[in-house]
Amino acid sequence: MKVQPSVKRICDKCQVIRRHGRVLVICDNQRHKQRQG
């Protein structure tokens, strides 16, 4: 999980979602997991 000031999709399978007021990127590739913070 990377914590970054701005989250971006890295590949086509990345999905940007909001959970509990946080912006997350979830993906099949675990290296692409990101959280905004």
Swiss-Prot record:
GO terms for molecular function: structural constituent of ribosome. InterPro entries: Ribosomal_bL36 (IPR000473), Ribosomal_bL36_sp (IPR035977). GO terms for cellular component: cytoplasm; ribonucleoprotein complex; ribosome. Keywords: Ribonucleoprotein, Ribosomal protein. The keyword Ribosomal protein applies. GO terms for biological process: translation. The keyword Repeat does not apply. Belongs to the bacterial ribosomal protein bL36 family. This is Large ribosomal subunit protein bL36B.
